[in-house]
């Protein structure tokens, strides 16, 4: 039970970060925010990961760096979309990476995904169409978040193919460090880099950099050794629900019947597609969810 509670707590933290990040990037440049966020995450993981990085070798380090740059691209798209649409929409559309993962595996590796996954695609796509028809968000924002979900799905599939033989903590550290480097270059090129000011920005940076990323990874690793895969999947399915809860209570999201119906359809699509995604990833889908919380 403590492990399940810990996992649910982590998903609640992920849910509230969407609200915090939306508020922060309204007053602090997007790429600068993400660069600092990944700098904090990398620094937090540096101590426990430092002795393990050598074990990755050159191939592992290069692979981690490449996947880290993909991760940075996904976060940039997701956060740009979050700026333009609602917190609740962002949470549910981001969750569509579960639906898209089997499709990307099909395209790249001809993996079979089954009728349930196709059903999930259809239902989730219908939900996305319903969300795009409301006035609370924006089609452009929703599409940016959907593009982020596609990048996350690609990153997941490549991760499963090339990373299982490497230490998870060391590989994650390299990914986060590479994401930081890539985002830093963009922030400097745009002239956006500056010292963050105010609790709104620093609060979001600390929660996303320390609790949602680095400590979230450690809690997740501890908890998943002490509970079943079924309970883990149950806990992680709460993330979009938490996002909607905090979007409604803290960000004032009012999506109406059509919008909330779209969220429900996307959630149903995720539930339908998740078994196929788990098969594609040899049961490792839950261990990768951490990467795509705000």
Predicted regions and their residues:
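Specific transmembrane alpha-helical segments of multi-pass solute transporters/efflux pumps
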Residues: 13, 17-18, 46-94, 130, ...
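Glycine-/small-residue-enriched transmembrane alpha-helix faces in small-molecule transporters
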Residues: 1-32, 69, 73, 77, ...
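C-terminal-most transmembrane helix of multi-pass membrane proteins
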Residues: 1, 38-39, 128, 201-203, ...
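Juxtamembrane helix-entry segments on the extracytoplasmic side of multipass membrane proteins
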Residues: 1-4, 25-31, 35, 56-62, ...
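Transmembrane alpha-helices of multi-pass small-molecule transport proteins
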Residues: 26-73, 100-104, 151-158, 172-191, ...
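C-terminal transmembrane-helix exit sites in multi-pass transporters
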Residues: 44-53, 97-119, 241-261
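Helix-helix packing/entry segments at the starts of transmembrane helices
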Residues: 35-36, 90-98, 158-181, 213-249
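Hydrophobic transmembrane alpha-helices of multi-pass small-molecule transport proteins
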Residues: 45, 71, 113-132, 149-152, ...
């Amino acid at each position: 039970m403590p492990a399940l509670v810990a996992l649910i707590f982590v998903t609640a933290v992920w849910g509230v970060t969407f609200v915090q990040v939306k508020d922060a990037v309204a007053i602090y440049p997007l790429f600068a925010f993400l660069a600092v966020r990944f700098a904090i995450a990398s620094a937090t993981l540096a101590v426990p990961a430092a002795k393990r990085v050598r074990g990755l070798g050159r191939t592992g380090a290069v692979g981690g760096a490449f996947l880290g740059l993909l991760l940075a691209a996904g976060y940039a798209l997701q956060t740009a979309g979050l700026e333009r649409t609602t917190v609740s929409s962002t949470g549910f559309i981001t969750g569509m990476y579960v639906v898209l993962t089997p499709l990307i595996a099909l395209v790249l590796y001809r993996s079979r995904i089954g009728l349930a996954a196709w059903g999930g695609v259809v239902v989730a796509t219908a939900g996305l169409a319903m969300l795009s028809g409301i006035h609370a968000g924006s089609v452009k924002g929703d599409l940016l978040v959907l593009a982020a979900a596609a990048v996350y799905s690609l990153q997941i599939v490549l991760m499963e193919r090339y990373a299982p033989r490497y230490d998870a903590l060391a590989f994650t550290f390299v990914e986060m460090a590479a994401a930081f480097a890539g985002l830093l270059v963009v922030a400097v090129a745009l002239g956006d880099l500056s010292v963050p000011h105010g609790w709104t920005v620093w609060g979001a940076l600390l929660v996303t950099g320390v609790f949602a990323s680095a400590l979230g990874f450690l809690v997740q690793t501890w908890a998943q050794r002490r509970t079943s895969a079924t309970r883990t999947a149950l806990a992680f399915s709460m993330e979009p629900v938490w996002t909607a809860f905090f979007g409604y209570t803290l960000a004032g999201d009012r999506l109406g019947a059509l919008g909330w119906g779209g969220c429900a359809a996307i959630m149903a699509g995720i539930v339908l597609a998740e078994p196929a995604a788990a098969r594609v990833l040899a049961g490792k889908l839950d261990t990768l969810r951490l990467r795509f919380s705000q």
